[in-house]
Amino acid sequence: MRLLRFYPGRNRFVYTWHDCQARSGLRPFHHQMEKKRMATQTVYQFKITLKGIRPPIWRRFQVHSDITFYELHRIIQEVMGWYDGHLHLFELGGMIITDGETLAEVWEDGVDEQRTRLPQFIRQAGQKLRYEYDFGDGWEHELLLEKILPAEAGVHYPRCLKGKRACPPEDCGGVWGYAGLLEAMADKSHSEREMYLEWLGDEVDPEAFDLAEINETLQEM
């Protein structure tokens, strides 16, 4: 059964999947399968950094190594604080990995992210790839595979370990637009400050980072 949940703290809807049968007689079976998976599973530890902004905005997080690039995209959206309202892509060694619709329209020789698992292209610690979100604003991220680790028993993946600074607001004009926004918000006499306040609905704290809130959302994935 597919359920649509609304999380007031994030002001957004999140799709989650629940197997209703697993809540009854099949729960022990699914629990055993998960234990078996954990026994052989490895974990990828990534550090993602938003490029072009200082001090840097970054997150360190861990995922099961066998997830698809689409699942990685969804996790990145959550740990960074984006709202998944725009196109995106991964680039590794000149290879484009993105959703099937974008491939059909733009990159015919690319790779479908929903049919491609991480180990098909990412196998060694130290590998880097580019993740771009919102082709208009052009938010570019560097994604570094820091470590390959055994999964820990009793730990939910994905999980965020650490991070710094808040994600910029959506549709603010990219790196330069965000710099202008922060400049206006820091100066109460700035001519554009009221416009930004009306648009955003609140003050912007560029240093904000709530690890607990991020992991609470990841628990639903």
Model regions and ranges:
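Extreme N-terminal basic, low-complexity initiation segments
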Residues: 2-8
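Short linear regulatory motifs enriched in tryptophan with gly/pro/ser
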Residues: 13-21, 25-221
